[in-house]
Amino acid sequence: MSETTHTAIDTAYPGNLFMVVAPSGAGKSTLVNALLAQDKAIRLSISHTTRSPRPGEQNGREYHFISVDEFRAARDRGEFLEWAEVHGNYYATSRVWIEEQMAQGTDVLLEIDWQGAQQVHKRFSNAVEIFILPPSLTALEERLKKRGQDEPNVIVRRLLAAGSEMSHASESDYVIINEVFDDALKQLQNVVHATRLRFSSQKARHAELFIELGIH
Protein backbone atom coordinates (compact mmCIF):
# COMPACT_ATOMS: atom_id res chain seq x y z
CA MET A 1 0.00 0.00 0.00
CA SER A 2 1.13 3.56 -0.66
CA GLU A 3 0.10 6.94 0.60
CA THR A 4 0.48 10.66 0.19
CA THR A 5 2.14 12.04 3.31
CA HIS A 6 -0.22 13.99 5.56
CA THR A 7 -0.28 15.18 9.13
CA ALA A 8 -2.71 13.28 11.33
CA ILE A 9 -6.09 14.96 11.70
CA ASP A 10 -7.40 15.28 15.24
CA THR A 11 -10.33 17.48 14.25
CA ALA A 12 -13.49 16.21 15.92
CA TYR A 13 -15.77 15.81 12.93
CA PRO A 14 -19.48 15.28 13.65
CA GLY A 15 -19.21 12.06 11.64
CA ASN A 16 -17.21 8.97 12.60
CA LEU A 17 -14.88 6.85 10.49
CA PHE A 18 -15.11 3.06 10.78
CA MET A 19 -12.75 0.53 9.21
CA VAL A 20 -13.76 -3.12 8.88
CA VAL A 21 -10.85 -5.51 8.35
CA ALA A 22 -10.93 -9.28 7.84
CA PRO A 23 -9.27 -12.14 5.99
CA SER A 24 -11.01 -13.38 2.87
CA GLY A 25 -13.90 -15.67 3.80
CA ALA A 26 -14.56 -14.24 7.26
CA GLY A 27 -17.85 -12.70 6.13
CA LYS A 28 -16.83 -9.05 6.16
CA SER A 29 -18.77 -7.91 3.09
CA THR A 30 -21.95 -9.74 4.13
CA LEU A 31 -21.85 -8.11 7.56
CA VAL A 32 -21.12 -4.68 6.12
CA ASN A 33 -23.96 -4.92 3.60
CA ALA A 34 -26.39 -5.95 6.34
CA LEU A 35 -25.25 -3.06 8.54
CA LEU A 36 -25.67 -0.54 5.73
CA ALA A 37 -29.13 -1.88 4.90
CA GLN A 38 -30.29 -1.28 8.48
CA ASP A 39 -28.39 1.91 9.33
CA LYS A 40 -28.95 4.77 6.90
CA ALA A 41 -26.74 7.14 8.91
CA ILE A 42 -23.58 5.42 7.69
CA ARG A 43 -22.18 5.38 4.16
CA LEU A 44 -19.73 3.03 2.49
CA SER A 45 -16.66 4.63 0.94
CA ILE A 46 -16.44 3.67 -2.74
CA SER A 47 -12.88 3.24 -3.99
CA HIS A 48 -11.46 4.75 -7.17
CA THR A 49 -9.85 2.43 -9.71
CA THR A 50 -8.29 2.55 -13.14
CA ARG A 51 -9.37 -0.97 -14.08
CA SER A 52 -12.17 -1.51 -16.58
CA PRO A 53 -15.70 -2.17 -15.27
CA ARG A 54 -16.74 -5.82 -15.19
CA PRO A 55 -20.12 -6.98 -16.51
CA GLY A 56 -22.87 -5.70 -14.24
CA GLU A 57 -20.73 -3.13 -12.47
CA GLN A 58 -21.86 0.49 -12.39
CA ASN A 59 -19.73 3.58 -11.99
CA GLY A 60 -20.19 4.95 -8.49
CA ARG A 61 -21.65 1.73 -7.09
CA GLU A 62 -18.86 -0.87 -7.00
CA TYR A 63 -16.10 1.62 -7.86
CA HIS A 64 -15.49 5.06 -9.28
CA PHE A 65 -13.87 4.17 -12.61
CA ILE A 66 -11.33 6.75 -13.77
CA SER A 67 -8.44 6.93 -16.23
CA VAL A 68 -4.80 6.52 -15.24
CA ASP A 69 -4.17 10.21 -15.95
CA GLU A 70 -7.12 11.22 -13.77
CA PHE A 71 -5.90 8.92 -11.01
CA ARG A 72 -2.35 10.27 -11.05
CA ALA A 73 -3.56 13.87 -11.08
CA ALA A 74 -5.83 13.27 -8.07
CA ARG A 75 -3.05 11.42 -6.26
CA ASP A 76 -0.58 14.24 -6.87
CA ARG A 77 -3.12 16.75 -5.53
CA GLY A 78 -3.28 14.76 -2.29
CA GLU A 79 -6.91 13.74 -2.77
CA PHE A 80 -6.36 10.10 -1.80
CA LEU A 81 -6.12 8.79 1.73
CA GLU A 82 -4.27 5.67 0.60
CA TRP A 83 -3.63 4.02 -2.74
CA ALA A 84 -2.14 0.86 -4.19
CA GLU A 85 -1.23 -0.71 -7.52
CA VAL A 86 -2.60 -4.24 -7.90
CA HIS A 87 -2.00 -6.32 -11.03
CA GLY A 88 -1.27 -3.20 -13.06
CA ASN A 89 -4.36 -1.29 -11.92
CA TYR A 90 -4.56 1.52 -9.40
CA TYR A 91 -6.97 1.59 -6.44
CA ALA A 92 -7.48 4.39 -3.93
CA THR A 93 -9.64 5.73 -1.12
CA SER A 94 -10.84 9.31 -1.48
CA ARG A 95 -9.68 11.51 1.40
CA VAL A 96 -11.70 14.47 0.10
CA TRP A 97 -15.01 12.58 0.01
CA ILE A 98 -14.49 11.10 3.48
CA GLU A 99 -13.74 14.49 5.02
CA GLU A 100 -16.76 16.05 3.30
CA GLN A 101 -19.08 13.33 4.60
CA MET A 102 -17.73 13.45 8.15
CA ALA A 103 -17.89 17.25 8.24
CA GLN A 104 -21.59 16.97 7.38
CA GLY A 105 -22.15 14.57 10.28
CA THR A 106 -22.30 11.40 8.18
CA ASP A 107 -20.53 8.29 9.45
CA VAL A 108 -18.27 6.61 6.88
CA LEU A 109 -17.26 2.95 6.67
CA LEU A 110 -14.24 1.53 4.87
CA GLU A 111 -13.82 -2.12 3.87
CA ILE A 112 -10.05 -2.26 3.93
CA ASP A 113 -7.05 -4.50 4.57
CA TRP A 114 -4.76 -4.16 7.58
CA GLN A 115 -2.11 -2.29 5.59
CA GLY A 116 -4.64 0.27 4.43
CA ALA A 117 -5.95 0.59 7.99
CA GLN A 118 -2.48 1.51 9.19
CA GLN A 119 -2.29 4.29 6.59
CA VAL A 120 -5.74 5.58 7.51
CA HIS A 121 -4.76 5.80 11.18
CA LYS A 122 -1.89 8.10 10.21
CA ARG A 123 -4.44 10.53 8.78
CA PHE A 124 -7.40 9.93 11.10
CA SER A 125 -6.14 8.99 14.55
CA ASN A 126 -9.70 8.58 15.87
CA ALA A 127 -10.78 6.09 13.20
CA VAL A 128 -12.37 2.98 14.73
CA GLU A 129 -10.95 -0.33 13.48
CA ILE A 130 -13.11 -3.45 13.70
CA PHE A 131 -11.53 -6.82 12.90
CA ILE A 132 -13.77 -9.71 11.81
CA LEU A 133 -12.47 -13.20 12.64
CA PRO A 134 -13.77 -16.66 11.68
CA PRO A 135 -14.67 -19.07 14.51
CA SER A 136 -11.89 -21.42 13.36
CA LEU A 137 -9.50 -22.09 10.49
CA THR A 138 -11.65 -25.04 9.50
CA ALA A 139 -14.71 -22.80 9.24
CA LEU A 140 -12.74 -20.29 7.20
CA GLU A 141 -11.67 -22.99 4.74
CA GLU A 142 -15.24 -24.29 4.44
CA ARG A 143 -16.56 -20.81 3.72
CA LEU A 144 -13.97 -20.21 1.03
CA LYS A 145 -14.91 -23.51 -0.63
CA LYS A 146 -18.65 -22.81 -0.42
CA ARG A 147 -18.23 -19.49 -2.20
CA GLY A 148 -17.21 -21.42 -5.30
CA GLN A 149 -15.17 -18.50 -6.58
CA ASP A 150 -11.65 -19.88 -6.34
CA GLU A 151 -9.63 -22.85 -7.51
CA PRO A 152 -8.16 -25.12 -4.79
CA ASN A 153 -4.68 -23.61 -5.17
CA VAL A 154 -6.12 -20.12 -4.73
CA ILE A 155 -7.93 -21.21 -1.57
CA VAL A 156 -4.64 -22.51 -0.18
CA ARG A 157 -3.02 -19.13 -0.87
CA ARG A 158 -5.91 -17.31 0.78
CA LEU A 159 -5.63 -19.50 3.88
CA LEU A 160 -1.90 -18.86 4.11
CA ALA A 161 -2.50 -15.13 3.71
CA ALA A 162 -5.23 -15.25 6.35
CA GLY A 163 -2.74 -16.31 9.00
CA SER A 164 -0.60 -13.27 8.33
CA GLU A 165 -3.61 -10.96 8.15
CA MET A 166 -5.14 -12.19 11.40
CA SER A 167 -1.88 -11.57 13.25
CA HIS A 168 -2.74 -7.87 12.95
CA ALA A 169 -6.05 -8.22 14.80
CA SER A 170 -4.25 -6.93 17.90
CA GLU A 171 -3.96 -3.53 16.19
CA SER A 172 -7.75 -3.13 16.03
CA ASP A 173 -10.09 -1.46 18.51
CA TYR A 174 -12.72 -4.21 18.41
CA VAL A 175 -12.76 -7.88 17.42
CA ILE A 176 -15.91 -9.70 16.31
CA ILE A 177 -15.90 -13.49 15.88
CA ASN A 178 -18.34 -14.24 13.08
CA GLU A 179 -19.68 -17.63 14.12
CA VAL A 180 -23.42 -16.89 14.23
CA PHE A 181 -24.19 -14.20 11.66
CA ASP A 182 -27.03 -12.49 13.55
CA ASP A 183 -24.90 -12.27 16.69
CA ALA A 184 -21.95 -10.84 14.76
CA LEU A 185 -24.19 -8.27 13.07
CA LYS A 186 -25.61 -7.19 16.43
CA GLN A 187 -22.11 -6.79 17.80
CA LEU A 188 -21.10 -4.69 14.80
CA GLN A 189 -24.15 -2.48 15.30
CA ASN A 190 -23.29 -2.14 18.99
CA VAL A 191 -19.80 -0.89 18.14
CA VAL A 192 -21.25 1.73 15.80
CA HIS A 193 -23.82 2.86 18.36
CA ALA A 194 -21.28 3.02 21.19
CA THR A 195 -18.87 5.05 19.06
CA ARG A 196 -21.58 7.62 18.37
CA LEU A 197 -21.94 8.08 22.15
CA ARG A 198 -18.26 8.79 22.78
CA PHE A 199 -17.62 12.18 24.36
CA SER A 200 -15.73 13.47 21.31
CA SER A 201 -18.51 12.40 18.95
CA GLN A 202 -21.29 13.87 21.06
CA LYS A 203 -19.39 17.14 21.53
CA ALA A 204 -18.85 17.47 17.78
CA ARG A 205 -22.49 16.70 16.98
CA HIS A 206 -23.91 18.92 19.74
CA ALA A 207 -21.34 21.71 19.89
CA GLU A 208 -23.79 24.50 20.75
CA LEU A 209 -25.40 22.49 23.54
CA PHE A 210 -22.03 21.67 25.09
CA ILE A 211 -21.07 25.36 25.02
CA GLU A 212 -24.39 26.32 26.62
CA LEU A 213 -23.88 23.73 29.34
CA GLY A 214 -20.30 24.81 29.94
CA ILE A 215 -18.85 21.46 28.93
CA HIS A 216 -15.38 21.59 27.38
Curated annotation (Swiss-Prot):
GO molecular function: ATP binding; guanylate kinase activity
A matching Pfam family: Guanylate_kin
Catalyzed reactions: GMP + ATP = GDP + ADP
Alphabetically ordered keywords of this record: ATP-binding, Cytoplasm, Kinase, Nucleotide-binding, Transferase
EC number per UniProt: 2.7.4.8
InterPro entries: GK/Ca_channel_bsu, Guanylate_kin-like_dom, Guanylate_kinase, Guanylate_kinase_CS, P-loop_NTPase
Residues at which ATP binds: 22-29
Ranges of residues in domain Guanylate kinase-like: 15-193
Any one GO cellular component localisation term in the record: cytosol
Top EC class of this enzyme: transferase
SMART domains for this protein: GuKc (SM00072)
Compartment(s) where it occurs, according to its Swiss-Prot or TrEMBL record: Cytoplasm
Database matches in HAMAP family: Guanylate_kinase (MF_00328)
Family: Belongs to the guanylate kinase family.
Functional summary from the UniProt entry: Essential for recycling GMP and indirectly, cGMP.
Alphabetized PANTHER family for the sequence: GUANYLATE KINASE, GUANYLATE KINASE-RELATED
Protein name according to UniProt: Guanylate kinase
Organism field: Cupriavidus metallidurans (strain ATCC 43123 / DSM 2839 / NBRC 102507 / CH34)
Lineage per the UniProt record: Bacteria, Pseudomonadati, Pseudomonadota, Betaproteobacteria, Burkholderiales
Name of the gene: gmk
